[in-house]
């Protein structure tokens, strides 16, 4: 019966997009305020029916210092507790609830939509189509999801506390497929995870998928992973266990195998208008004058010549990923419908992939244009109308000043969450330089932002580490961008004799002297090198550094997210070099299959996993138990009088917390002077004063004092 209900939902979802009446209009030439000579026809045509039933070098001393010792009695299987039930909303109130939400946002939504498409004479028709289908998706949203929406509306700060712990993973690498993942939910709960980010799992062509970011069908799961029914069942089971699901939504482009792309390739003008097609290179050359390349070495250029159609198509990422034309309102509408469809399958957090790139304009760099913010603002309002329990996570891997605007304003918010990408990059910069000044500056900048802004904090993810640092600040110390990037990459790839890190470069561009970095946390901390050398002291110290970096990440303001495998110190996987589909992409170095054999060691204290996993478990529980880690609690840095030691303070009415982190290979003294009583180190249980704290090489303290 459950399966039949799910199938009925699928059928209803397909029909919702397909039933919009699309009377033929006369062809239209859209003017673009003379900023570019692109003509886009936007005849209102029948929407595509998408089938969903197919279904400076460093001397590394190896001074003997004990790794963290943590008492661990938690060896029993995790007890799965169901999330507390939310009172159901009477069905008769559904329409009034929807009308109230719509009325709250309608004027602004209309204004922004009509302003964005003011040159389109059919703008009113497109807007009405959008509003009509929004209501249909609301009607199809099941009661459990509506109840969750209602509960979260009553507590809009539900994601800003200290109770969310995230993990990101590839389904196939972790458990084979969606059903396999469902069978591993006990382990995920044992990792204290209640925010599960599943890397791209929608239909994409094998060998031309860009790790799943070349989507051929937004309403179909990759066949090797299962079906959309399997996904909906997984989200339902996760919700019963209090686990929120995050899923990537690739906005900038589709695969060349998408139905729209196929019809465009066959010469259908209305589908070519959903992308950027040109008969010759005249207009593309204007774009290329100011638009940087995303992948200058692996996929140079912003356009691809299609021999079969004798046209150029815009492909800013890979040649098989065709950029969508958001100047066409049909594109925006259809992509919003796809987002709402995924929300109705139980997605709690929608990750807006490559969102800064979605609006193109000649004479600009085609990044972070005002129209992008207009679209994200509209998406936020549409979610608040149809599915207000859903969060938007913006993937904005840009310079710091470009990231924050994607939060919008307090009155007109855009994304709920953003990646704390600059702090992540600054952390690894500190690992390589052993100088915390840049990291401290970055933390101070984040601390100065409104507390409504919530960042997603992380050490590693599926992607590379890009060196988007504050070079204006570094130049004050005579540090120049290009040679400094080279030093960072050389250190973290182990080119210096005494470097402990083992990483690989990604997209090395000799012309710019630029490259990005790949590798797992454990390999970058030295566990790989010292393990290979059978240097037990070195391994213990590397484990300590791994713990310290995670402790620092967990003590920041926001939501911590661990990359699957980091909890068991998984090392680089070099086997990708033997796979023709992966060999050219070094990011697969840290995308290897999850090592379940290593996970079995997590309760054996003599193993690497037994020394790491229990400490991370304790840190995560401490964070959830102490209100001082709430996202809305202010954070500030304090002087330690040592360039290698970082100290941060978080304080509310109940507690005062001081986190101290040693980024040096030497034992140090943190010359802090918080003369306000005795503190307890939450990690070891020791009591000490927050004055002249002795801290081991690559070690840390979590000092806490209760005020009441």
What are these regions, as identified by a protein language model?
Residues 2-10, 79-708:
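Active-site and adjacent substrate-binding regions of carbohydrate-active enzymes
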Residues 14-82:
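Long, intrinsically disordered low-complexity tandem-repeat segments
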């Amino acid at each position: 019966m459950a399966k039949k209900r799910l199938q009925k939902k699928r059928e209803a979802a397909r029909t919702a997009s397909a039933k919009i009446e699309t009377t033929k209009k006369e062809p239209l030439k859209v003017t673009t305020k003379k900023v570019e000579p692109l003509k886009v026809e936007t005849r209102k045509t029948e929407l595509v029916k998408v089938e969903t039933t197919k279904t400076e070098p460093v001397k590394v001393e190896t001074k003997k210092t004990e790794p963290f010792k943590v008492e661990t009695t938690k060896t029993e299987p995790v007890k799965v507790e169901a999330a507390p039930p939310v009172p159901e909303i009477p069905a008769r109130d559904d329409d009034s609830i929807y009308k109230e939400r719509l009325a709250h946002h309608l004027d602004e939504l209309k204004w922004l939509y009509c302003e964005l498409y003011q040159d389109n004479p059919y703008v009113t028709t497109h807007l009405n189509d959008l509003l009509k289908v929004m209501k249909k998706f609301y009607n199809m949203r099941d009661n459990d999801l509506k109840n969750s929406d209602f509960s979260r509306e009553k507590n809009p700060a539900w994601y800003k506390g200290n109770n969310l712990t995230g993990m990101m993973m590839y389904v196939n690498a972790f458990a084979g497929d969606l059903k396999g993942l469902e069978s591993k939910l006990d382990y995920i709960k044992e990792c204290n995870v209640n925010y599960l980010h599943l890397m791209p799992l929608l239909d994409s062509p094998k060998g031309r998928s860009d790790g799943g970011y070349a989507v051929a069908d937004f309403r179909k799961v990759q066949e090797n992973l299962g079906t959309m029914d399997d996904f909906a069942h997984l989200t339902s089971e996760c919700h019963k266990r209090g686990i929120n699901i995050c899923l990537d939504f690739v906005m900038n482009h589709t695969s060349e195998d998408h139905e729209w792309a196929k019809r465009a390739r066959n010469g259908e003008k209305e589908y070519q208008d959903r992308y950027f097609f040109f008969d010759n290179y005249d207009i593309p050359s204007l774009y290329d004058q100011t638009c940087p390349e995303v992948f200058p070495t692996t996929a140079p250029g912003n356009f691809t010549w299609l021999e079969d159609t004798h046209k150029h198509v815009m492909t800013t990422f890979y040649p098989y990923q065709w950029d969508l034309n958001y100047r066409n309102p049909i594109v925006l509408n259809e992509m919003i419908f796809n987002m709402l469809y995924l929300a109705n399958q139980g997605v709690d957090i929608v990750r807006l992939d490559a969102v800064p790139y979605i609006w193109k304009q000649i004479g600009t760099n085609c990044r972070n244009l005002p129209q992008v913010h207009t679209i994200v603002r509209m998406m936020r309002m549409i979610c608040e109308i149809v599915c207000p329990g859903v969060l938007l996570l913006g993937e904005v891997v840009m310079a710091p000043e470009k990231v924050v605007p994607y939060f919008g304003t307090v009155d007109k918010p855009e994304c709920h969450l953003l990646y704390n990408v600059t702090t992540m990059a600054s952390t690894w910069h500190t690992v390589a330089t052993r100088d915390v000044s840049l990291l401290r500056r970055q933390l101070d900048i984040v601390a100065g932002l409104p507390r409504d802004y919530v960042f997603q904090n992380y050490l590693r993810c599926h992607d590379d580490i890009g060196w988007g640092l504050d070079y204006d600040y570094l130049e004050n110390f005579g540090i120049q961008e290009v040679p400094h990037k080279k030093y960072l990459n050389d250190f973290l790839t182990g080119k210096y004799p005494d470097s402990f890190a083992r990483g690989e470069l990604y997209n090395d561009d000799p012309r710019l002297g630029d490259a990005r970095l790949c590798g797992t946390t454990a390999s970058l901390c030295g566990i790989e090198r010292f393990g290979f050398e059978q240097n037990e002291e070195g391994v213990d110290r590397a484990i300590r550094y791994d713990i310290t970096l995670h402790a620092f990440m967990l003590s920041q303001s926001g939501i911590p997210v661990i990359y699957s495998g980091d909890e068991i110190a998984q090392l680089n996987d070099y086997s990708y070099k033997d796979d023709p589909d992966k060999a050219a992409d070094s990011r697969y170095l840290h995308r290897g299959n999850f090592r379940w054999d290593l996970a079995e060691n997590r309760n054996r204290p003599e193993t690497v996993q037994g020394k790491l996993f229990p400490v991370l478990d304790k840190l995560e529980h401490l964070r959830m138990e102490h209100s001082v880690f709430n996202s809305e609690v202010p954070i500030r840095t304090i002087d330690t009088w040592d360039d290698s030691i970082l100290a941060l303070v978080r304080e509310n009415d109940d507690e005062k917390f001081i986190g101290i982190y040693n980024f040096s290979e030497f034992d140090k003294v943190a010359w802090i002077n918080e003369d306000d009583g005795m503190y307890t180190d939450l990690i070891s249980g020791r009591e000490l004063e927050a004055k002249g704290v002795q801290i081991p090489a690559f070690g840390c303290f979590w000092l806490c004092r209760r005020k009441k």
